[in-house]
């Protein structure tokens, strides 16, 4: 379990899942691929839900449940608990959203649905890359990246809830609010009841959570929002333990499974003039939009508020890591383009943009390590391994 909890191995699992998916999709002949794709996306288990929806709607709701727990902790007692702590990551997060959107719309204005795709940061992947290659960086870089990613996730939640909601059923929304409220009440009671009574409250919480998910799923709002609502309503005392318990399943099963399904596309053989502008918009938005948005807005905020919370070089590292959209960007791409010819090109753009951002971040971290080695006494001329 300790390996699966590791940020390093989480990033490796995600990368391997995406790579295997692309290989799998492209070695199959077209007929077999079509049959597999139809089985995953069109076959309804018991006539209720497809395997794709189980992963993208149900399992990802569990991931967003954990994200909401982390977000609540950071807002109440963590790195976002006060204005002075939150202002620099907040400005950086705003820049990391606004600039990629601007780049995307300037390049792909004919396909405006895709503007949310380059706004996301994959917290698991970016922290994993930092853990593998950034061991020589100060610990505050991880804290800053985590705060930035949490705010990015918050923005992503708002985007999913507003931009990708269709045919809203207010009746189901009312039912969802009631069940989420009951979940919160049960959580409150669980924190204060005797151990002997927990066997009654825990099943009630699970039933309320399932009912809330079904209600949101039926409401027209993306079902992952159910996980967010439940995570926010969970009693803070229980949050850390539940998040810790879910961590190996999220890192080892849920995120790799979604990465595999989302990246399972056939690479089209297209001439340059047939490449969708959405591909360029997403790619440039992730690679350059995130880098410029986070770093430029961050520099302005540091100067304006006279803060020294992070150095310019470390801010560049965080900016590059912010361009690793991966799983969350793949989700946004599905919501924006699934069922259209642009979808596969969007997946390729997310994967290439995230990979190039990761490579840029690794180069910057290696430069920092080399510079640090030269500055230490007695290390002149040594090769840093």
Curated annotation (Swiss-Prot):
First-listed, main subcellular location of the protein, grouped into a coarse class: membrane
Keywords: Antiport, Cell membrane, Ion transport, Membrane, Sodium, Sodium transport, Transmembrane, Transmembrane helix, Transport
Disulfide bond annotation, renumbered to this chain: none
GO biological process: regulation of pH
Entry's localization field: Cell membrane
GO molecular function, one term: sodium:proton antiporter activity
Family: Belongs to the NhaA Na(+)/H(+) (TC 2.A.33) antiporter family.
Function: Na(+)/H(+) antiporter that extrudes sodium in exchange for external protons.
Protein name as annotated: Na(+)/H(+) antiporter NhaA
Source organism (scientific name): Tropheryma whipplei (strain Twist)
């Amino acid at each position: 379990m300790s390996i699966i909890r590791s940020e390093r191995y989480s990033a490796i699992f995600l990368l391997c899942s995406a790579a295997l998916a692309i290989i799998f999709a492209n070695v199959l002949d077209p007929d077999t691929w079509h049959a597999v794709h139809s089985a995953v996306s069109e076959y309804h288990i018991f006539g209720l839900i497809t395997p794709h929806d189980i992963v993208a709607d149900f399992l990802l709701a569990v991931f967003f449940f954990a994200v909401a727990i982390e977000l609540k902790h950071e807002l109440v007692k963590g790195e976002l608990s006060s204005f002075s702590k939150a202002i620099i990551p907040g400005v950086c997060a705003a820049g990391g959203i606004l600039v990629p959107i601007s780049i995307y719309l300037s390049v792909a204005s004919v396909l405006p649905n895709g503007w949310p795709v380059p706004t996301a940061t994959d917290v698991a992947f970016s922290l994993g890359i930092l853990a593998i290659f950034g061991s020589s960086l100060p610990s505050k870089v991880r804290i800053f990246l985590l705060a930035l990613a949490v705010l990015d996730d918050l923005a992503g939640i708002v985007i999913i809830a507003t931009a990708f909601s269709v045919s809203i059923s207010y009746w189901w929304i009312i039912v969802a609010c009631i069940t989420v409220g009951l979940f919160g009440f049960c959580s409150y009671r669980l924190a204060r009841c005797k151990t002997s009574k927990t066997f009654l409250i825990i099943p009630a919480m699970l039933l309320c959570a399932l009912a809330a998910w079904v209600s949101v799923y039926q409401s027209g709002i993306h079902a992952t929002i159910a996980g967010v609502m439940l995570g926010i309503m969970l009693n803070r005392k229980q949050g850390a333990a539940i998040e810790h318990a879910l961590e190996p399943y999220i890192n080892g099963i849920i995120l790799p499974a979604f990465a595999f399904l989302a990246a399972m596309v056939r690479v089209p053989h297209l001439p340059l003039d047939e490449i969708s502008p959405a591909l360029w918009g997403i790619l440039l938005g992730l690679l350059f939009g995130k880098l410029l948005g986070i770093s430029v807005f961050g520099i302005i905020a540091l100067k304006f508020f006279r803060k020294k919370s992070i150095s310019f070089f470390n801010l560049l590292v965080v900016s590059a890591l912010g361009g690793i959209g991966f799983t969350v960007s793949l989700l946004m791409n599905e919501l924006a383009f699934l069922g259209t010819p642009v979808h596969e090109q969007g997946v390729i753009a997310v994967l290439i943009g995230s990979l190039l951002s990761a490579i840029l971040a690794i180069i910057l971290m290696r430069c920092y390590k080399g510079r640090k080695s030269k500055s230490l006494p007695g290390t002149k001329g040594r090769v840093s391994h």
